[in-house]
């Protein structure tokens, strides 16, 4: 069976990082490599063929965009998508105003059709309007804001198989 790749991205920060407040950064420690906080949520059912891309691996790296990450073979997300002749991506996750935004803007910059699943994202909102502003910026860059039922219609056929996109 010919699968389109499913790529799951994650923050995978070292214990000591300039990304964290303790290292002069903006954020409390989170998603420290090999910790429970860096694990995918137990309700996220990832198929066996899922490609995992980790970002924020280096002590001096923020790793906001998934396009800054690599898989276990040291392959960048851009190279993974290109190798599979992927033309479009669906983006969801945390946080709308940081990682989602950076990933979507990079996806558009690299020429990918980009869908943002608005009922599967959540902002940090350091300022009350950050999430809304990020959504506008992504839309202005050409991303399509959709809900999860639209993704289902776009990519899954009635028989459960996936549409080629």
Enumerate the predicted regions with their spans.
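Active-site alpha/beta core segments
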Residues: 1-88
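Generic beta-sheet signal
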Residues: 9, 55, 117-119, 148
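Structural recognition of alpha->loop->beta junctions
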Residues: 33, 37-51, 128-160, 165
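Short, charged, surface-exposed secondary-structure boundary motifs
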Residues: 63, 125-128
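A short glycine-rich beta-strand->turn/loop micro-motif centered on a GG-aromatic cluster
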Residues: 90-93, 113-125
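Histidine-anchored nucleotide/phosphate-binding helix
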Residues: 98-111
């Amino acid at each position: 069976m010919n699968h389109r790749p499913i790529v799951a991205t994650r923050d995978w920060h070292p214990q000591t990082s300039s990304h964290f407040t303790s290292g002069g950064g903006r954020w409390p420690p989170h998603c420290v490599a090999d910790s429970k906080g860096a694990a995918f949520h137990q309700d996220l059912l990832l198929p066996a063929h899922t490609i995992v891309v980790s970002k924020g691996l280096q002590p001096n790296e923020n790793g906001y965009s998934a396009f800054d990450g690599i898989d276990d073979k040291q392959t960048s997300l851009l190279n993974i998508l290109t190798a599979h002749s992927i033309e479009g991506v669906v983006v969801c996750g945390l946080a709308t105003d940081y990682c989602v935004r950076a990933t979507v803007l990079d996806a558009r910059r690299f020429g990918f059709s980009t869908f943002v699943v608005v009922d599967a994202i959540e902002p940090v909102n350091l300022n009350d309007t950050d999430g809304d502003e990020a959504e506008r910026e992504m839309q202005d860059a050409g991303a399509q804001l959709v809900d999860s039922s639209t993704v289902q219609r776009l990519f899954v056929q009635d028989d459960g198989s996936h549409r080629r996109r």
